[in-house]
Swiss-Prot record:
The active site is at K98. Homodimer. It comes from Geobacillus thermodenitrificans (strain NG80-2). This is 2,3-diketo-5-methylthiopentyl-1-phosphate enolase. Pfam families: RuBisCO_large, RuBisCO_large_N. Keywords: Amino-acid biosynthesis, Isomerase, Magnesium, Metal-binding, Methionine biosynthesis. The modification N6-carboxylysine is found at K173. Binds 1 Mg(2+) ion per subunit.
């Protein structure tokens, strides 16, 4: 029998096993011991089962926080897939719908059978496809966030796009809070942006992609995305958690939207930060987004301005790139507060197949966006060569200025 196995972290004053059994029954057949034998036999294939309990013992900080003694355990429950349709909304409603309202319960993971995974598309392009588009195979990619664009016009956008591209970035993304407006209409951002980046390409031979923010009412998104594809959009930035995972999957599965999708984590912080409630970041920002079809996934880095714990951030990256999964690997994009002095940490922790993503770390450089991009490229080259930044700055003025402004964290070989 095909099942989905959900892993939870439970905190409860009472019997953890009893709590787990109540969840397994309550989210499937509702009751069991009071049913006649014939009905039990008929419903057996629909019944949830507790398949594992690992008791963790009490947590002093948790007891102090809740002002009561709580037992803790990792609990695994198997849900028969015959109970729900093969889509993410049904999966979430079953495994963590009303349960998310029921005390101190946190969803850590969902294990899907190979049969069930076939219902999901995964990334259309993934790491390999994106690398082919930019022609870069031997280093982390560099992306610039288009900051300070709200209230500006197309002339400003194209001018700043060129500067960022001339600095050597591989991608430029819209700010996630840049929406369709009279000064910067969606379609004109695409056409003007492509023209500007083509000019730089003809000048330098270096290809830069532009991720335009796909926004608007949910039921208008597909037509808008199709139009973007027709206009030659490089990448679509998408605030997936303000719309829903199934909307992302719908965009990915439409064959007329043959454009990479970059998932932004905006609003996910409402679901992930607590150790007692919500959804683990590796599941929400990792496994789910890869299943649904994101080619890139932004998430807070462990050392920036909106930091995740290091192991949580690495867990997201592992979920996006695990080669045991039957999907293309998605690009991890650790973000927020990144500057050139952090590049050695990024390379150490996330390796070659990640994207170094910066806003203020590029635009705030003393020499502007061009200098900011150059500083990052020099830092990436130094990290890959195993050189300390304090040595690399001797050969690169842009990197020296960046380190003078933001400092650096060296990673000794």
């Amino acid at each position: 029998m095909s099942t989905v196995i959900a892993t939870y972290l439970l905190h409860d004053e009472k019997d953890i096993r009893k709590k787990a059994e109540g969840i397994a029954l309550g989210l499937t057949v509702g009751t069991w011991t009071d049913l006649p034998a014939l009905e039990q036999e008929q419903l057996r294939k629909h019944k949830g089962e507790v398949v594992g309990i690992e008791e963790l013992g009490e947590s002093g900080p948790a007891n102090e926080y809740f002002d009561k003694r709580l037992k803790r355990a990792i609990v695994k429950i198997a849900y028969p897939t015959v109970n729900f349709s093969a889509d993410l909304p049904a999966l979430l409603a079953t495994t963590f719908g009303k349960l998310s309202l029921d005390g101190e319960v946190r969803l850590l993971d969902l294990e899907l059978s190979d049969e069930w995974k076939r219902h999901f598309p995964g990334p259309r392009f993934g790491i390999a496809g994106i690398r082919e588009k930019v022609g870069v195979y031997d280093r982390p990619l560099l992306m610039s966030i288009f900051k300070g664009i709200i209230g500006r016009d197309l002339a400003y956008l194209t001018s700043e796009l060129k500067k960022q591209a001339l600095g050597g970035v591989d991608l430029v993304k819209d700010d996630e809070i840049l929406f369709d407006n009279e000064l910067l209409p969606f379609e004109k951002r695409i056409t003007a942006g492509k023209a500007a980046l083509q000019e730089v390409y003809e000048q330098t031979g270096k290809r830069t992609l532009y991720a335009v923010n796909l926004t608007g009412k949910t039921f208008e998104l597909k037509e808008k995305a199709k139009r973007a594809a027709e206009l030659g959009a490089d990448v679509l930035l998408f605030n997936v958690f303000t719309y829903g995972l199934d909307v992302l999957q719908g965009l990915r599965e439409d064959e007329n939207i043959n454009v990479p999708i970059m998932a932004h984590p905006a609003f996910s912080g409402a679901m992930t930060p607590s150790e007692f409630y919500g959804v683990a970041p590796s599941l929400l920002l990792g496994k789910f987004l890869r299943l649904a079809g994101a080619d890139f996934v932004l998430f807070p880095s462990p050392y920036g301005s909106v930091a995740l714990e290091r192991e949580q951030a690495l867990g997201i990256a592992r979920a996006l790139t695990d080669e045991q999964e039957p999907f293309a690997r998605a690009f991890p994009v650790p973000s927020a507060g990144i500057h050139p002095g952090l590049v050695p940490l990024l390379v150490r922790d996330f390796g070659l197949d990640c994207i170094v993503n910066a806003g203020g770390g590029i635009h705030g450089h003393p020499d502007g966006a061009i200098g900011g991009g150059q500083a990052f490229r020099a830092a990436i080259d130094a990290a890959l060569a195993g050189r300390l930044l304090r040595e690399a700055v001797k050969e690169n003025e842009a990197l020296q200025k960046a380190i003078d402004r933001w400092g650096a964290i060296e990673v000794e070989a």
